[in-house]
Amino acid sequence: LSSSSAASDVYKRQTIFVPERMIVSVVCEEADYQAVEAQIAFLLKNLYPSKKIVKERSLPELHLEKKNEGFMDASQVQYVARAGNYVRHGFSYHGALRILKVIMGYDYLWINVRVKGGAYGCMNSYMRNGDTYFVSYRDPNLKKTDEIYDGIPQYLADFKADEREMTKYIIGTISDMDTPMNPSAKGARSMTAYLQGLAFADIQKERDQVIGATDEDIRGLKDLIASVLEEKNLCVIGNEDNLKSQSDMFMQLKNLYE
């Protein structure tokens, strides 16, 4: 290392590993906490001295770039992903998205991507910060799966479920939310809530929205999902010949193992 880069490295360490930046998550019996607290105090003493420059924790500004990449390999299947962010388009998180995940996973995506399409599986997720994705894995298709994703808004516009069907979806959603957790999992959940700035009221609101959801709430997600898909963010890992034959779907193709 040059002297300037070495000095920069030291400066970074001295501004990162300071008491103000330390977060500790402890999961233990109350009787054991005193011993843990002593270890935390010891660690604090061995960090770099405070420079009094830490005002608040914030993420660095990220400059996102749409690439629509296809990564080619020798496999005979694809992993097809579409992603986007609904918050960027003015939408907010709603507990009905929890139910949508169940509906997609056991109905629309499962039937079209897994059963009819022959993929090994499929996933979907809707995060509080707006990040959303739809993914297939070990999928013999590419463009067909992408078109299935594009069909989600129309599926939602036409969605109908009677009280019995909605109750089934709600029970499936709540069972996922109420999965039994060991102490470690509870600690991880609490840490995540702290880092995300989630209060108990936020979690209760989500639960109330799930329990009180109707098929109208599911139909109401159409525009939110459409906003994500309209971003046309695509990433695929799959067979070289398949990707090259459908290269118009991508902005760039790369060998996966380069």
Please place each PLM-identified region on the residue numbering.
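Single conserved hydrophobic/aromatic residue that forms the stacking wall/gate
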Residues: L1-A7, Y11
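Short, conserved charged micro-motifs
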Residues: A31-A38, F91-H94, L142-E147, K244-Q246
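A glycine-rich, aromatic-flanked flexible loop/lid motif
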Residues: K67-R82, R114-D131, R138-Y149, K186-T192
